[in-house]
Amino acid sequence: MLLELARWLAQDIRGFNVFNYITLRAVLATLTALTISFLVGPKLIRKLTEYKVGQSVRDDGPQTHLVKAGTPTMGGALILIAIVISTLLWADLSNRFVWVVLITTLGFGVIGWVDDWRKVVYRNPKGLSAKAKYFWQSLIGAGVAAYLFHTATVPAETELIVPFFKHLVLPLGAVSFIVLTYFVIVGTSNAVNLTDGLDGLAIMPTVMVASALAVFAYVAGHLYFSKYLGVPYVPGAGELTVFCAAIGGAGLGFLWFNAYPAEVFMGDVGALALGAALGTVAVIVRQEIVLFIMGGVFVMETISVMLQVGSFKLTGKRIFRMAPLHHHYELKGWKETQVVVRFWIITMMLVLVGLSTLKLR
């Protein structure tokens, strides 16, 4: 929106051409999202408290979590507001990828909103039924996958890139691309949601991964940088740098209120949306495997649930004291803040490994 205004003004005042630089707009998107979070956050928290939009806590969870009952939830709406406004202000709105990620993010956010609303209104910690949730997630995920495949303008947009191997590129047909994209988007969405169980646990890894994806998006959308680093060139992908920067700013702003002891929880409206956003960006910039590496904490949390459920159904025994994984460590005696910070450190290490794939080929 502001980019178009700047381009119009640049016809008479050349200084406005500076807004054509993606890097500048990414910085401004971060600051804008951060500012919106700081300004809107306290008001939103007061409203959520006033309307008693409080978190329901599972009876079978760690006993230390019982004090969290009643803490305002659905704070993910704050994140989405900041991301959307910031992106609309600073991104190139003629870029199709910008609209793909915005629509996907908001679509999953709506699913999360309904899920949270049912938890609040009906006082049911399980919220929306699993079948209904996965149906709508699948519908959006498959739709986005089909759109991206059929609107691809260069072969690189539908190729699977294997990190650390310079020339290992796997062309994907329609079915394989759509299936892979579906699992990346839906899988990441649910993985972030599973991780969002402790104060600040999910949001900081999300910020770190989004920041790294911003780098990949910038490189993938830059003809010369992509060629130099051996990254597939995806025309238009650079604008996703602005979107990822908005996620980073909104996430840090939310962390201000979500840090232990949390004043507000993001709820499914935030977790499902953020996971879908990360997955969609990774697909567009062709870094699905790198996302798997950088989002290792999300992966571990998801696998722990799958192993726990599978083991209990097959043998009647549990592998972990409780799943997802963060609860296992809580029951082992780790303090909540220890689990959170240690998972942050792990994510930081994995993000650095992911970024190293830009050069180590």
From Swiss-Prot:
Signal peptide segment: none
Keyword Cell membrane among record annotations: yes
Pfam families per UniProt: Glycos_transf_4 (PF00953), MraY_sig1 (PF10555)
Domain of life: Bacteria
Transmembrane segments: 21-41, 73-93, 97-117, 134-154, 168-188, 200-220, 237-257, 264-284, 289-309, 338-358
Membrane topology: Multi-pass membrane protein
Enzyme Commission number(s) from the entry: 2.7.8.13
The protein's annotated pathway: Cell wall biogenesis; peptidoglycan biosynthesis
Subcellular location: Cell inner membrane
Broad enzyme group: transferase
GO cellular component: a single term: plasma membrane
Record family assignment: Belongs to the glycosyltransferase 4 family. MraY subfamily.
NCBIfam families in the cross-refs: mraY
Protein name, as recorded: Phospho-N-acetylmuramoyl-pentapeptide-transferase
